[in-house]
Structures are given as C-alpha cells and as structure tokens.
Amino acid sequence: MDYLDLVDAHIDRRADITIAVQPVSLEDASGMGILRLDRDGQIAAFEEKPTREQLGGMPTRGQTPGLAAMPPDKPFMASMGIYVFSRDVLLDCIAQDGATDFGKQIIPHALSRYRVHAHLFRGYWADVGTVRAFYDANVMLTSAAAPFTFYDPRRPMYTHPRFLPGARFNDCAVRDSIINEGSHIDRARIEHSIVGIRTTIRSGASISRSVLLGADYYEADDNAPARGNNPGLGVGSNVVLDRVIMDKNARIGDGARLTNEPGVDHADGDGYYIRDGIIVVPKDGVIQPGTIV
C-alpha cells in the first residue's frame, strides 16, 4: 500500500479517522473487524470478530455507491488494522479510561463522536493472525503466480542491514524457494519453502512447503559441550520436513521426520505443536534425533 493514497483520502473527506479496508468472505469475516458503511461511505457500525448472527446486518456490497464492484463472494468489509487519525482526535481517543484496543474499544466508541471513513484498498493484503494464515501467506510467496512479490522495482522492499554473507549451497537441489542471507545448506533438497537468515541445513535434509525463520546467531559445530544433549542449531542430517513452521533458534536433530502423515489437525507434543494441520516448532524449540511427527 502507498500510504500517501490513504492520507490523501483522509484529507479530501475531512475525516477524523480513516480506516483501510478490504472485502472478505463470510468464512473469513468472523475472525476480523467488520464494518458497515452508510451511503456516503462513512462507517456506521463496527464489530470486532462478530458472530454469524451479528454478520447478518453487516454486509456492505450493494448498499454503498462505488462498491458495487465488490466480489460477490466477499460481501463484508474488513478493517486492515491500518488507521489515519487527525492528531487531536487520536489524543482524545487514547485518553479514554482503559481504552487500549483499537478494534474493541477505540473505533467503536469513536463512531458516534467523529467522522470515521473507510478507504478501500484494492491491492494485495492478507491477515496473518492465525497459524494457517501465516503459513499460507509465506508459502504463497514461493509461487511464480503469487499475487504479491518483494521484487517489484517500482516498490522495492528493504530490511535493516545485517552485513551477513550470501547464502552458501553445497551440492543442493532448490526449486521455487526463497533463501535468505547467511544461510549454509549442505547437500539438501528444498522446494516451495522459505529459509530465513543464518539457517544451517545439514546433509541429506529434505524440506518442502515449509517456513524456516532462521537464527539470531551462529553456533560452531564443535560446541557440543555447551548445548548438552541438544542437537545443533538448525536442521540436522537426513531430516524430512513438510508443511512445517520452524521458529527462530530451533533445533531439529538428525533423522527426524516432521510430515504429519496422519493429517492431525490439532495437537501438542514434545517440542512442537500442530495447528490447522501445520507443524510448528516454537522459538528455541528442540526436536530430538529420530523424532517422527
């Protein structure tokens, strides 16, 4: 999003508050902040994570001029959690006793006191507030047909400099993946995956449809006494990962197999958990050698 468009819309409408919004489906609406617009495009009602019953009075499609082109399968308007406030209005809103949550407190209370408008954003946006949504949004980036790319020369994306060396590959097979700097990958197979900074992947590993968030530091291979019985930082030899989120500084021991072949939807295990069928190894988590999930 070009935030200048949002700010310009806020000024042009003489709004006190402007909320960036996108149309969503019935299935997605119950997990988001849903708003209803009046015929002038001003927000008339707002419900944070509404029930199915509350959604009955919230569809916007067909009721507001200029929004007739909304997809028929996405009749609800959802807040993107991106706001523009006029300065004095913001100070007044946050001065309310106990008002700390924009979706549940500040925005609903402001509707009767201020001009609160919506700004429809038609570009790519994804809510990554659940494990499945976070996973899908990341793996999607590895597709050649992805609706969003970090490599658009008109809108380049930057991260803060870390001054790491380039990723190093030794006799690897990598397809449709994003590999970040400072990674060291030895004789591994990687497809449709994201590999974060400073990731170590050892010989014989096979990684598919997974998101590895990398590490905050390097660890020497001869550092075994310091780590005790834990495997080395990163992914061990002959590990198989499929549909896995591996958080920062996690360790997966040699020969472990994390594939969720039974298709478990929700579970908690030793060093991991499963949500929406996705295996998650949390930050600093440890999977012992030979573990099968």
Residue ranges of predicted features:
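Conserved core of the sugar-phosphate nucleotidyltransferase
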Residues: 2-84, 97
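Left-handed beta-helix
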Residues: 64-73, 88-293
